[in-house]
């Protein structure tokens, strides 16, 4: 539930960005959030911050502003700097030190090599969980038959899933395996689909891809039609990007509660204006 409450901040920034008309305020908001997220990344977890910044930068450069060659060049330069920064954080985390000072010192030292290779290597690790799912299901653990997604829906109510053993073990299915197998494994929506539906999970992948396309369309058309709907599509997109390396239960609670709060505020403001 704490993660759900923290997600309200991220959702609020996206809503605020969509509501801004002044370019200076947009730039100031982007700078402050970018600085804050980068500082938070140096303390450890990077995935959620990176996923959020991807959506936020996309909104700022390609939705809220007119696309120009200069802005594209700026995005490319920012991506290169981001690769270096994230790789430096990963290198620092493997040692005994941590923090923004150590990360900046490493970046300035010139000791980092094969930065892009290391960054691309992170994508390969996403298949580890899928490989484990294919290898051990159903040989070691039985198919979930959709229990992971049922658990995700029920997880909207805090602490309930923990009281139902067969749902609890399905939330992170790899925890049913010996510790030596799942140690340091991240999540994977592909692995979760296979665990639940075997190769029929391919159909689920197509559905998720179609859904992501709908979200992007909602964001792109939001400025001409419905800014609130576009903001909500962007909020869901941050969770969906994390879903690639996560589990269904990771996003359901925070998305539903965020939608509930936004709906309450919207209803209150609408009633107040009439």
What are these regions (language model features)?
Residues 1-72, 76-99:
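Membrane-embedded catalytic interface detector for glycan/lipid assembly enzymes
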Residues 7-17, 33-39, 163-169, 188-194, ...:
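Short juxtamembrane and helix-loop transition motifs at transmembrane-helix boundaries
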